[in-house]
Amino acid sequence: MNLKNRLILEDYRKQRDDFIRLGDVVHNMLTDIVDSMGITVLGIEHRVKTEKSLAGKLERNGDWYSSFEDLTDILGARVICFFSDEIDKIGKKVEEAFVIDWENSSDKRALIKADTFGYLSLHYICSLPFGDRWPDEICGKKFEIQIRTTLQHTWAAINHDLGYKSEFGVLVVWHENFRELPDFWKLPMMSSSGCAMI
């Protein structure tokens, strides 16, 4: 590992506790957002990237990052909802509650390739605003929020286990067969009002 990546890991070790604190704040804020909207979700989760995971990322893609501050996914949070129209509703509240880095945020739901279905989430790169509400140590640090449906979440997990952990990958025909299952498609294609999303 080169000197630059070693320095990034050193900064990670120094700031890891701040990201752990930030994760708790973000989790609580997302919980409050969902509760205030009266939306029932499958879950809200967050994680701080481990040093081992970060080291592996730097080994694979280290040239993309010139400093620790270039990394936007040290902390990742996710809201898993039941209906597709709830993604945008929750997203609007996220945009109001956090500082959004629009340049690096993305809406991946326009993708329709079989091997990308599990990643069709709404992805925000966020930070907390500076002020009196939170300690300066956790404000301004970038983190990722994903909002996705239960099916997208399940498919991403399946794709990760069968795709990334298999040297042969996942057969495209398996992807296509999964996409054609009516019972799986029914839930995310329905709105929270019970009407089909066209």
Residue ranges and their predicted role:
Residues M1-D18, L22, C139-I198:
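An acidic, glycine-/histidine-flanked metal-binding catalytic module
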Residues M1-A77, C81, D85, K186:
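Charge-rich, low-complexity segments
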Residues I90-A97:
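Short amphipathic alpha-helices in soluble, non-transmembrane regions
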Residues C81, C126-L128, I147-T149:
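Flexible glycine-/small-residue-rich
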Residues D101-L128, D132-P135:
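Short Gly/Thr-rich strand-loop-strand
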Residues K89-I90, R133-D136, H153-A156:
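Short helix/loop capping segments that flank catalytic or ligand/cofactor-binding pockets
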Residues L75-A77, L120-Y124, K141-F143:
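Generic beta-strand structural signal
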Residues L30-V41, W102, D132, S192, ...:
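Long, hydrophobic, amphipathic alpha-helical segments used as structural scaffolds
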